[in-house]
Amino acid sequence: MSDLEHSTTHVEHEYGGSEIQVLEGLEAVRKRPGMYIGSTSLSGLHHLVYEIVDNSIDEALAGYCTEIDVAIGEGDIITVTDNGRGIPVDIQPQTGKAALEVVFTILHAGGKFGGGGYKVSGGLHGVGASVVNALSEWLTVQVHKNGKIYEMKFSRGHVTEEMTVVGTTNYTGTTVTFKPDPEMFEDTVYDYETLHTRMREEAFLNAGLKINIRDERAGKEQSDSMCYEGGIREFVSFINQNKTPLHEDVIYMSGERENSMAEVAMQYNDGFNEITVSFANNVHTPEGGMHEEGFRRALTTVLNAYGKKVGLLKGDDKVSGEDCREGLTVIISVKLTDAQFEGQTKAKLGNSEMRTLVNSIVSDRLEQYLEENPAVGRAILEKAMMANRAREAARRARENVRRKDGLEGATLPGKLSDCYERDPSLTEIYIVEGDSAGGSAKQGRDSRYQAILPLWGKMLNVEKARADKVYGNDKLTPVITALGAGLGDDFDEMKLRYHKVVIMADADVDGSHIRTLLLTFFFRFMRPLIERGYVYAAVPPLFKLTRGKVTRLAFSEEERDAISAELRGENPDAKVAISRFKGLGEMDPHELWDTTMNPQTRTLKRITMEDAVKADAIFTLLMGEKVEPRREYIEQNAFRAANLDY
């Protein structure tokens, strides 16, 4: 528990009803659930679990909870148990009600706001328990406290059974069991892997905290137990497990100031991509903020000063922040009172004092580390200097691309068949594998709003290439120029010429490879394209089934068999003609339009990226240098090959 205690601020008094503050009522939650949990899709469904777990994490941050259990039961009923102090059960002065009832029925009620109950707290603006209650068909909470077991039951935010004592206990803690309300959610089936990924993240962020997760649903049984004494150091090692480290140690730095603390773990690898993952009070901040800014400033300053000191940088030589972060994996975690997040979803941290704190910690500790480990310091600096030279080469290559670039047809790639429409929100570009398929697509498209760009030959695997190679690659340059938005830090969404970028490749191994190469390119060099939801994969059919005048398409063997049986009806001997599409190039323009390009009849899969760390790991695995981990992954996931790219 020493690491956990080091990273939390212990609140030295009882946690009682007087610590619960009430800010406003619950009425709005069921009317506008998206305001409180982001959406009513699967993302929002899983958010319910995170809200309850966040309350348990708060107990861990305060130094009172060492273990959390999360279970998915039959019927997708969730149970979260912790061994904290237990939610208060005494009377809350402001309302005259039991504090337990207040926590679960009144929005913004919790020990989070005045600093009395918790010095540091995560959760979505403190709305947790009551919002989960409002969006649950039913919810039961049991509290072990004062030697007694208290129980209270709710339905859709209302009390159905008052708080009663149901037994005695020698333990303390809270158990919340709930069933999401199908009236509120598009889907109520939980995905174990999604919850497991989030719980693993929480375990990394709270050193020494044990989190158990299990799936008890019939046919889906699995479980895991996670506890990382090394905290975010182990998180960095986990992310880098299929990369080749530049130095063996994960560099760890931490410090405190008043009621705030920050910790940073970092390690370089021999790749070219930066992975920065930041958190504030255990909440992921994908858009960064002041803590990231403080780290970047300190890193650049320290490496330049060190380079001058050891004579690697001479005169006016210097390395940029981008150079310093090439091949870097870093986790930044800060914990603070009164965290200011920009936006309801807490995507960016706004507390300027965190920039100062992180900058100070990294400046002092990193300088000291480099002094004590000169071989590591030299390796890091030489990598940054090499990145600097490559960046200059990339800039020259980029200028060459820019000189040829522009939004008018004359300067666009010769192979591009552009559309007439100029409003990007109405246009789409099909990036098509092979000239023959490209020809059919050109003839079959609606040229008012559909552009076609055929690709041919062997494409560059950008996972193994620096930016200068990408800019100079004759297979990728047409894609860069056609899209018009630039690459990397120069990517400008306002210049994007199409708001649907559709990858159209055969449904075979070669097609999957092309899709993966393109997705790797977009992920590494045009990530906003994926983050904003502009990238799609066309899903061409595999089979055409005909009986008489009725023709149907099937996208899998299972669907083929089901449609075949449906067409035969009550006559099992009826003849159904089944033909297999071997490739896009075999379809005539009319077929390609009907099956793959007509907005009324086609199937498109939007490529999403909810977990950047997981996406990075998969791209590194599938497209990186190490063969053995890739072989293992493919062998383990071969049965899911149909979904591998999505």
What are these regions (language model features)?
Residues D58-E59, G86-I87, V509-D510:
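Residues immediately C-terminal
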Residues R389-E408, D423-E428, G439, Q443-R445, ...:
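C-terminal interaction appendages of subunits in large macromolecular complexes
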Residues M1-S18, L26, Y50, D58-A60, ...:
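GHKL-family ATPase ATP-binding module
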Residues P93, E342-R355, L553-E559, I563, ...:
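Helical (often loop-to-helix) elements that flank the catalytic cores of nucleotide-handling enzymes
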Residues K31-Y50:
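Conserved short strand/loop->alpha-helix "switch" segment adjacent to the catalytic nucleotide/phosphoryl-transfer site
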Residues I87-G110:
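Short conserved segment of the HATPase_c
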